[in-house]
């Protein structure tokens, strides 16, 4: 092998190695910033179609309704714990160490984003509450729609509002 071919081969190997390194770093960065949406039932039992459970330490988003009577506040700090449930019966505990949104209430729909710290417990970094009685985050509405039966109202019920 002459010097010219050796130089080209070295350049080609270095170029392929550089592209592979950049691609792997890019995939790693995208994977670490990926937040998958789960319902409380999916966290406990796994995704319905695949049965895949989220891993401890994984960043996820959880949507559901705040269980009435489950909120516990620490009087000396901003720490709060509450349970989130869905219609299928799944329930997880959420801990949060910041100010809750003004519209946060028990019995309301929320989306909490954070890290799963143990089975059925989420350390939230962000809590989003719906902004009026008719709004529900799209992910929660879709997940709840899959597990809730649609209500049929008669004409009297529709006009009583």
UniProtKB/Swiss-Prot annotation:
Functional description taken from the UniProt entry: Heme chaperone required for the biogenesis of c-type cytochromes. Transiently binds heme delivered by CcmC and transfers the heme to apo-cytochromes in a process facilitated by CcmF and CcmH.
Provenance organism: Shewanella sediminis (strain HAW-EB3)
Organism superkingdom: Bacteria
Alphabetic keyword roster: Cell inner membrane, Cell membrane, Cytochrome c-type biogenesis, Heme, Iron, Membrane, Metal-binding, Signal-anchor, Transmembrane, Transmembrane helix
Cytoplasmic-side positions: 1-8
Primary location group: membrane
Periplasmic side: 30-161
A Pfam family hit: CcmE
GO molecular function: heme binding; metal ion binding
Compartments in which it is found: Cell inner membrane
Record membrane topology: Single-pass type II membrane protein
TM regions (residue ranges): 9-29
Family to which the UniProt record says this protein belongs: Belongs to the CcmE/CycJ family.
A GO CC term assigned to this protein in UniProt: plasma membrane
GO biological process terms, semicolon-separated: cytochrome complex assembly
Protein's name in the database: Cytochrome c-type biogenesis protein CcmE
UniProt cross-references to InterPro entries, sorted A to Z: CcmE, CcmE-like_sf, NA-bd_OB-fold
The keyword Heme appears for this protein: yes
Residues annotated for heme binding in this entry: 131, 135
